A protein has these predicted regions:
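Solvent-exposed, acidic/flexible segments
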Residues: 29, 42, 49-56, 115-122, ...
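Acidic/histidine-rich, surface-exposed loop or edge segments in extracytoplasmic proteins
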Residues: 30-47, 103-111, 285-287, 304
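Bacterial Sec signal peptide processing site at the extreme N-terminus
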Residues: 9-34
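Pan-zinc metallopeptidase signature
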Residues: 229-344
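A ubiquitous short alpha-helical element
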Residues: 18-23, 220-227, 287-294
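Acidic/His-rich structured neighborhood in mature extracellular/periplasmic domains
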Residues: 58-225, 237
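Bacterial N-terminal signal peptides
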Residues: 1-10
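Sec-exported extracytoplasmic/periplasmic mature domains
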Residues: 44-45, 58-68, 175-179, 196-208, ...
Length: 344
């Protein structure tokens, strides 16, 4: 997730109330932090917290020194908070297409999400959009990049994360801090998703080894995530075909319900996909809609394209990959250039 802090502190007059409230929360959660170094030197710091902070330091160092990501003061401070995530984010799509509802922000351009520190505020925005006929999703976000506006801290709820999850999160957000393209939310998230996951696996191999439980668990977790994304991609393609027809909007909505119901039945039947972990149990209960599918598409649709570039043109080096992304970004549409380059 990127730039949420800037969303809270930039905008037009119609957003003043939103900006003032969310900006105050941003300051609350980014101040009153403790330097990691002083906590490590403090003998009263618990062993659990100490080990966690050392792990975060190691991940951050790896991201900077080995992956070539930006060296800044993110994740050098710690914040104790009594919640299990940071913000609730609203996204919406047209009910009969994958046209995303966009919010306009100075500096960042048009983005398909809006964040809130209090769930009732997010639910209110979601209700407003549902009344307008949009498919809506409200999701929990555990971290975001403020692109240098503040020093992004580590939060106490992250202590429960697996090594892969915390490494992927930190590297994902540091990727945003390293390269951000205005108005290109899909590319920004796809790039950060790819670098975050690939970088996390590299760090795990170096730190724990490929035969370790930490690495094997990460492989299983990623295999399940890839399978889940492939299932959603297949569903999205079926719905896209429905939306491309010349039938009426009402007929499209009816057919959409049929396609989603059929998809859910397939998740629970004899031919149900086999997942390695319990993370994706009870998928048939998912509240699937265009906003949900669009969310996953934004983060993953062109990850295979970026992976192919990473392997073929960067020799499997994230450092070279990031350098190439910066060079392509300076010349225009990154993904168009990647596709063209791979076709040669």
């Amino acid at each position: 997730m990127l730039a949420m802090g800037l969303l809270f502190v930039s905008g037009c007059a119609s957003q003043v109330g939103y900006l003032a409230k969310q900006g105050s929360y941003l300051l609350r959660y980014s101040t009153g932090t403790r330097p990691v170094q002083s906590m490590l030197a403090d003998t009263s710091t618990s062993a659990e917290t100490r080990n966690f902070l050392l792990k975060v330091q190691d991940i951050k160092s790896y991201a900077v020194q080995r992956l070539g990501l930006k060296n800044n003061e993110n994740y050098t401070r710690y914040k104790e908070i009594e919640r299990d995530h940071l913000v609730d984010v609203v996204q919406a799509c047209d009910a009969a297409s994958f046209d995303a509802y966009m919010w306009n922000y100075p500096f960042l351009g048009r983005l398909p999400y809006k964040g809130f520190y209090e769930r009732p505020d997010a639910d209110g925005e979601a209700a407003r959009l549902r009344l307008l006929g949009y498919d809506v999703i409200v999701r929990q976000v555990d971290a975001f990049s403020t692109l240098g506006f503040t020093k992004d801290p580590i939060y106490s709820f992250m202590k429960s994360y697996s090594p892969f999850r915390i490494a992927s999160l930190i590297i994902h957000e540091q990727t945003h801090a390293t390269l951000f393209l205005k108005g290109q939310s899909d590319f920004n998230e796809e790039m950060a998703t790819f670098v975050g996951d690939e970088g996390a696996f590299e760090w795990l191999r170096q730190t724990y080894g490929e035969d370790s439980p930490e690495y094997r668990d990460a492989v299983d977790s990623q295999a399940d995530a890839d399978l889940f994304v492939s299932l959603l991609h297949g569903l999205s393609e079926k719905l896209r075909a429905v939306y491309a027809t010349s039938i009426t909007r009402e007929e499209k909505l009816a057919r959409k319900t049929e396609v989603i119901d059929e998809f859910k039945r397939g998740l629970a039947g004899e031919g149900a996909p086999h997942f390695r972990t319990a993370t994706y149990g009870h998928l048939e209960k998912l509240q699937l809609n265009n906003a949900y599918l669009s969310l996953y598409g934004m983060y993953t649709d062109d990850v295979p394209l970026l992976r192919e570039w990473f392997v073929q043109r960067c020799g499997g080096s994230i450092r070279l990959f990031m350098e190439s992304m910066k060079q392509l970004a300076a010349r225009g549409d990154v993904k168009a250039q990647v596709r063209s380059g791979l076709e040669r």
